[in-house]
Structures are given as C-alpha cells and as structure tokens.
C-alpha cells in the first residue's frame, strides 16, 4: 500500500508491502519505508523523520499470533529562536535501530469486518542502538458484538507508554 498525507505544514508518505503467505509457509512478511517532513515556522522548528523496517508474523498457537521485526529511524530536528525551550533541547539528529516483538490473542469470528469476538495484543520495541535509548510498550484491545441485524457494536482501547533508559529523556 502507498499512503500520502499533505497539508500546509507537513508531508507524510508511507510505502508498505506485505506478503501474506511468504514462501508458502503461512508466515506474513512485511516491509515498509516512511518519511515525514514538518515545517512549522510559527512554532520555530522543522524536522524530517525517515524510517524503515521489516517484520514477520505467524500463528504460534491456535489463535495466538507472534510478530518479530527490526526498524530503523533517523530524526533531524532544526529549531529557530521562536522554538520552545523543550524543542531547543531536542534539536539535532537522532538515529535508532530497534527490535520489535509482539503477541496477539485473536478470538474474532473473522478478521475482516468482525461481528463477534475480540482481539488483544501487546507489542514492545527495544533499542539495539539509539542516540536516546527507550522502551516502548503498547497494549491494544478490540471487542465486537452483534447488537441487531444491522448494528455491530465495537469497543476499542489503545495504550502506549514510552520510557527513557538511564539518564536519557524520551524525545
């Protein structure tokens, strides 16, 4: 898939390719490349973020899926005199290489437009190399229930925490 978002102050693009049955093994293989540029002269900064990654997903046990991957990101932040003190502290170029893994328990009746069931997932990103080391944890949950013939109820929750390691602050 290819996604582009453009507005007056930013340009974002992502190219994502997924092979849902890599080498006929039942594992999915995903590659992505992304770039984002934000030019905010009123707030005193401009930044460019470029990244890419590769991951694989597979059904480890019945309804339990595992995901493993690596991602790399480069963030170049330039500030001017009008930037906040917080942004000025973050000014510079930062690189990271992270190992990502996750698990999902999928009890939906079908993956596309489910009418019953739930999916619960946990994902974590750990630094292999990072100018500012961090750990990112994400917990997501979605629940689906048929309320009537034409109405499906859905409840969703998404929580993410990013914590700096050692004396490093989170950017």
Predicted regions and their residues:
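A generic structural motif
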Residues: 37-39, 126-130
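Hydrophobic, well-ordered secondary-structure elements that form the walls
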Residues: 17, 141, 157
């Amino acid at each position: 898939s290819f996604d582009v978002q453009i507005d007056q102050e930013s340009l974002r693009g992502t190219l994502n390719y997924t092979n849902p049955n890599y080498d006929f093994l039942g594992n999915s293989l995903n590659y992505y490349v992304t770039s984002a540029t934000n030019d905010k002269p009123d707030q005193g900064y401009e930044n460019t973020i470029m990244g890419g990654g590769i991951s694989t997903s597979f059904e480890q046990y019945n309804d339990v899926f595992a995901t493993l991957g690596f991602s790399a990101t480069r963030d170049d932040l330039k500030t001017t005199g009008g930037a906040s003190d917080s942004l000025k502290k973050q000014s510079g170029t930062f690189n990271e290489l992270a190992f990502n893994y996750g698990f999902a328990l999928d009890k939906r009746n079908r993956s596309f437009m489910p009418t019953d069931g739930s999916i619960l997932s946990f994902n974590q990103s750990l630094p292999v190399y990072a100018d500012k080391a961090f750990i990112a944890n994400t917990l997501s949950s979605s629940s689906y229930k048929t309320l009537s013939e034409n109405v499906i109820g859905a409840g969703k929750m998404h929580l993410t925490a990013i914590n700096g390691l050692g004396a490093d602050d989170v950017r």
